[in-house]
């Protein structure tokens, strides 16, 4: 399932490898925090020519960077970034329609840290994403804490995920035992098929 060499291991790469071993080509994929577009591009490659990828971000420069990256890589027929809040995800991926939803919380790399995801909005976005997932679908979230953004978002999302009913979801939290407490934290949520 995971084929990384230790020097290449990051929280984002781990989440990507876990998704790559889980999802199948085709279907609907959502990058709920598209940033510079690297996760959106990753999802386009997973989705393949039969799939469709939607990237969401509240910053115009993130949407532009993502759409440029997709075009440069010939993926603009598969994926598109849209200027929208991740809490509004259900407008673009109705309930039960998404195979995969990916979050990489925090701030836009290379931009001012004054604009970053917030606890209340992030929990609402995760709740919407879980509703958007098909049974058998998967959500990934990389959570951050630190000097700039504090701990509230990471803790709020973790608390929400840990409270999900086991009858409907399996939650995987990948802690790196010898990394700093503020290190990025990859999490995966598998939505169980009905009757399992």
Map each language-model feature to its residues.
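S-adenosyl-L-methionine
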Residues: 1-28, 38-41, 45, 64-95
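Helix-to-beta-strand junctions that scaffold the AdoMet/dcAdoMet cofactor pocket
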Residues: 24, 47-48, 133-135
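Conserved beta-strand signature within the Rossmann-like core of class I S-adenosyl-L-methionine
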Residues: 33, 136-143
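Mobile active-site "lid"/loop adjacent to the S-adenosyl-L-methionine
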Residues: 102-125
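Class I S-adenosyl-L-methionine
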Residues: 147-196
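A short acidic, Gly/Pro-enriched loop at the edge of an enzyme's catalytic core
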Residues: 27, 91-100
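Conserved SAM-binding motif I beta-strand of class I
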Residues: 52-57
């Amino acid at each position: 399932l995971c084929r990384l060499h230790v020097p290449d291991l990051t929280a984002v790469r781990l989440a990507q490898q876990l998704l790559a071993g889980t999802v199948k080509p085709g279907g609907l994929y959502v990058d709920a925090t598209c940033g510079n577009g690297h996760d959106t591009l990753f999802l386009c490659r997973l989705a393949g020519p039969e799939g469709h990828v939607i990237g969401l971000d509240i910053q115009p420069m993130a949407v532009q960077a993502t759409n440029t990256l997709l075009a440069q890589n010939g993926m603009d027929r598969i994926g598109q970034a849209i200027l929208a809040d991740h809490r509004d995800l259900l407008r673009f991926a109705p309930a039960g329609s998404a195979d995969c939803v990916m979050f990489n919380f925090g701030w836009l790399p290379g931009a001012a840290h004054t604009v970053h995801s917030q606890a209340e909005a992030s929990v609402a976005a995760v709740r919407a994403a879980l509703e958007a997932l098909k049974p058998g679908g998967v959500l990934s979230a990389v959570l951050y804490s630190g000097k700039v953004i504090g701990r509230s978002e990471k803790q709020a999302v973790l608390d929400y995920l840990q409270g999900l009913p086991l009858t409907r979801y399996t939650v995987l939290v990948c802690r790196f035992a010898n990394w700093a407490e503020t290190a990025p934290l990859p999490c995966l949520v598998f939505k169980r098929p009905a009757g399992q």
